[in-house]
Amino acid sequence: MQDGYILYFDSGTTNTRAYLLNADLEVCHVIRRGIGSKDSAISGSNKVLVDCLCDMYQRMLEENHLSGDSIKRIYASGMVTSPYGLHEVPHLTVPLDIRKFAESLYRFHESSGIGRDIWLIPGLKTDRDDFSFAGNMRGEEIEIIGAMDELKKLGIHDAALVLPGSHTHIAYVKNDTVADIVSNFTGELFHALKSETVLAPVMDCVPEALDEDMIRLGADNCRRFGFNRAIYICHAMRIMNKYLPEQRFAYCEGVVNGGLGQILEYYLRNIWSDCKTVVLISDEFMYKLLSVIVSETCGELVRDVIWLRADRQTSYSVGGLKRIINVTGEKQ
């Protein structure tokens, strides 16, 4: 193996991935662990996460027959920059172009195990007088930078990027600049309803296909009646034995995610009026779900809905890191 490697940690709330990139910035090895900032928060210390990163570092060296000197630089993104991460780093403020972002990485010396400098990639936030428009992210920013390169290949330079997750973030990007962010509760809300409410039997369903009409009904009821009433209707469906289990499930998804359509419609109509393209960065399930909601709520405002597949085999975070390295010219 050729020397001149880069190690990149992508650490979230519940999982951490370590990527080994060669001198040509090609991924040659990946290690995954089910530990993230949540484990640090629960324990009251970041030691569990630091130990995880140190262990992954040693494993990466051993499994690839490398010495520490073979790793020329280490980067980390995501929740490692949060209070329960590796080291808290303040968010950068949008609008921010890729060059300024790449020049704003935070150099941190990890002394307890790895014993090296790690370049931490900050999150992003908005800064407006009206706090109702607040948005912030940690980890999604580097995915956005990676996705922007993919969109360039499609001739797209101006789009609203939707990144579903525990918190679904929508970022408006234009000409290599992250211009705005709007952040929302979604996946975490779904989990709470599934684990802590009487809707658990409805949401435990695993349908073979999503019923698009029921998604639309859920989203429409959320718009007409508000979340509280719309989600109760799903409970009533089960009590009164109305509709099939998979239809109730699709309805629930429409309610939980229907607000995203309303939020996106508001921003496209009132704030991002030049934007005519929506990009869904997700797995196939979320693409099918959100494409129905976007078409239903934003149809007259959107010209194209684009899908960028994101799964275990596709990492836009790695693509974002490559872009940062190429911008700064610091491979070594």
Where are these regions (language model features)?
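Adenine-nucleotide phosphate-binding core of ATP-dependent small-molecule kinases
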Residues: 220-263
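Short beta-strand-loop/turn "lid" adjacent to the catalytic site in phosphate-handling enzymes
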Residues: 63-108, 114, 119-134
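Short glycine-rich, Thr/Ser-proximal phosphate-binding strand/loop in the N-terminal lobe
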Residues: 6-48
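A short acidic Gly-Thr/Ser loop motif
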Residues: 9-15, 79, 162-167, 186, ...
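Phosphate/pyrophosphate-binding loops at sites that engage ATP/ADP/AMP, CoA/4′-phosphopantetheine
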Residues: 54-73, 261-274
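Glycine-rich phosphate-binding loop plus the immediately following alpha-helix
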Residues: 36-44, 125-160, 164-224
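Glycine-rich phosphate-binding loops at beta-strand->alpha-helix junctions
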Residues: 15, 274-293
